[in-house]
Regions:
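Beta-rich strand-turn-strand
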Residues: 87-124, 128-130
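C-terminal low-complexity, charged extensions that often adopt amphipathic alpha-helices
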Residues: 105-110, 148-155
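Short small-residue beta-strand/loop micro-motif enriched in glycine and branched aliphatics
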Residues: 73-75, 130-133
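Flexible glycine-rich active-site/ligand-binding loops centered on an Asp-His dyad
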Residues: 126, 134-151
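Ribosome large-subunit tunnel/peptidyl-transferase-proximal elements
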Residues: 9-104
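Intrinsically disordered, low-complexity regulatory segments
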Residues: 1-6, 10, 139
């Protein structure tokens, strides 16, 4: 397997593609404490309802729940604290410009270890779907599944 393609996914936001139409994917680093890192290695992280927003010219990840590390002492972390994201300056300015447009949100899609064993987060620049859009995507998925069954049965 190529080094560039290696990803060990720790957490995934499964509802993201159902609730949002994702237009662009962005990879970012994330600043963590030691107890957060150990908790992520154990898989105790949830990306449900997590999103990124701009604060004082920086990007921060909000509502990402990383459980407290059981073996940590009194210096344990707060599970829902805002976490700073690491993105190149030009890319950050481009993202912030798009976020300020009406209807765009930066949501967390997945959290993973890259080939250098660094934790990265995949963010999606997305627009929220209306209820009728969600029903339409369910119909499309059902039809694609049905087509697969029909083609498989003919062979």
């Amino acid at each position: 397997m190529s080094d560039n393609l290696y990803k060990k996914v720790v957490a995934k936001n499964r509802r993201a593609s159902f609730d949002y139409s994702i237009e662009e994917n962005i990879e970012a680093g994330i600043i963590l404490t030691g107890s957060e890192l150990k908790s992520i290695r154990e898989g105790k992280v949830s990306l449900a309802d997590s999103h990124a927003a701009e604060s004082a010219g920086e990007l921060y990840l909000y509502n990402c729940h990383i459980a407290e590390y059981e073996k940590a002492n009194r210096f344990n972390h707060a599970p829902l604290r805002p976490r700073k994201l690491l993105v190149h300056k030009r890319e950050m300015q481009k993202i912030i410009g798009k976020i300020k447009l009406k209807g765009y949100t930066l949501i967390a899609l997945s959290l993973y270890f890259n080939h250098k064993n660094k934790i990265k987060i995949e963010l999606g620049l997305a627009r929220g779907k209306k209820q009728y859009d969600k029903r339409e995507s369910i119909k499309e998925d059902d039809w694609k599944r049905e087509q697969g069954r029909i083609l498989r049965d003919k062979k």
